[in-house]
């Protein structure tokens, strides 16, 4: 039984962690931190957790959490995880950070896009990017795992087989992605209000979204050369879910059937990545509440381009479910433990 603590437990990703870990047979939650809800029961903050946790949120220092826990999840805004993770690694405690602070092998890229100093370039270079389907073996031996962003998870899983196999021109990739409102977090803001989001869809972060360099870093590693993408996210009036539709030019003619075989081979044995049958395109509601990624693709023979669609739940495979998948790998548990649930549908 592993003792785990969550720093920043009352945001959406923190609450999703509690939901999943409350049914994990090898994890004991020993600390939930929150400044805003200190002294309140977690089930009072999120009544959906009633009957699954009796823990109280506490305003603890990171060291106080580490005194109790063998592994910590950090679910804080970017810029806050560096000192916490640095201290945890000094104490030999495993860390899974759900924010952006450790996702870049070169911390200068982080500083350029997030406009803040990093604080520990050396440790950033040693952190493992926590996408199990790509970095499984490195995650097993990692002490610090950088949980991927939600958009990058969807995009990388969608494009990895094509780039690894050299089937597409890396200079032609377009990623059109759409996310539910929970991706913006729980903090109150005008753009997340019901009357602002409902019956509307809009692009944001055009040509400037901070997930762009994260996507490019991982796709470049897969391709073995520099990859630059055009990435445009959109806000959907749904609670959770991401649908990414990706386009790229083929370097040689290929059929849909040939590329389907490439995907089937690449993801053979993967418990959470599923290539749907021909003609059945991913729906966000099919992965709602699950750690699954649904994929499909088709070749447009008129234009010589391939179209790939990828759907995930932004809070589960795009955040907390993937964090638990990483925990399982780091601790030697079955990778699917506490995660084997289908999407909620309808």
Swiss-Prot record:
Catalytic residues (UniProt): 150
GO biological process, alphabetically ordered: L-arginine biosynthetic process
Disulphide bond pairs: none
Enzyme Commission number, as recorded: 1.2.1.38
GO function terms (MF aspect): N-acetyl-gamma-glutamyl-phosphate reductase activity; NAD binding; NADP+ binding
Keywords annotated in UniProt: Amino-acid biosynthesis, Arginine biosynthesis, Cytoplasm, NADP, Oxidoreductase
PROSITE patterns named in the record: ARGC
Subcellular location: Cytoplasm
Family as reported in the entry's similarity comment: Belongs to the NAGSA dehydrogenase family. Type 1 subfamily.
Name under which the protein is recorded: N-acetyl-gamma-glutamyl-phosphate reductase
Organism: Moorella thermoacetica (strain ATCC 39073 / JCM 9320)
């Amino acid at each position: 039984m592993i003792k785990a603590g969550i720093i920043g437990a009352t945001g959406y990703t923190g609450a999703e962690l509690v939901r999943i870990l409350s049914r994990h047979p090898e994890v004991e939650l020993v600390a939930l931190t929150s400044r805003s809800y200190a002294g309140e029961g977690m089930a009072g903050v999120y009544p959906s957790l009633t009957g699954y946790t009796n823990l109280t949120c506490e305003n603890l220092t990171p060291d106080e959490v580490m005194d109790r826990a063998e592994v910590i999840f950090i679910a804080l805004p970017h810029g806050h995880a560096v000192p916490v993770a640095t201290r945890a690694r000094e104490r030999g405690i495993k860390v899974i950070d759900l924010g952006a602070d450790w996702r870049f092998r070169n911390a200068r890229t982080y500083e350029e896009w997030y406009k803040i100093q990093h604080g520990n370039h050396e440790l950033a270079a040693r952190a493992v990017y926590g996408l199990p389907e790509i970095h499984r073996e490195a995650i097993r031996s990692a002490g610090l795992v950088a949980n991927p962003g939600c958009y990058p998870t969807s995009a990388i899983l969608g494009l990895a087989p094509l780039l690894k196999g050299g089937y597409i021109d890396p200079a032609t990739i377009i990623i059109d992605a759409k996310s539910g409102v929970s991706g913006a977090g729980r903090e109150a803001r005008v753009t997340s209000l019901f009357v602002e989001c409902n019956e509307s869809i809009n692009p944001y972060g055009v040509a400037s979204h901070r997930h762009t360099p994260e996507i490019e870093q991982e796709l470049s590693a897969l391709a073995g050369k520099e990859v630059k993408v055009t990435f445009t996210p959109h806000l959907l009036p749904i609670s959770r879910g991401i649908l990414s539709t990706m386009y790229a030019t083929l370097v040689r003619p290929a059929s849909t059937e040939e590329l389907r075989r490439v995907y089937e081979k690449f993801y053979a044995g993967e418990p959470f990545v599923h290539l749907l049958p021909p003609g059945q395109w991913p729906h966000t509601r099919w992965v709602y509440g699950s750690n699954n990624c649904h994929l499909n693709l088709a070749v447009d023979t008129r234009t010589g381009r391939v179209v790939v669609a990828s759907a995930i739940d932004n809070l589960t495979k795009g955040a907390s479910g993937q964090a638990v998948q990483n925990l399982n790998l780091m601790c030697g548990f079955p990778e699917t433990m506490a995660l084997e649930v289908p999407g909620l549908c309808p």
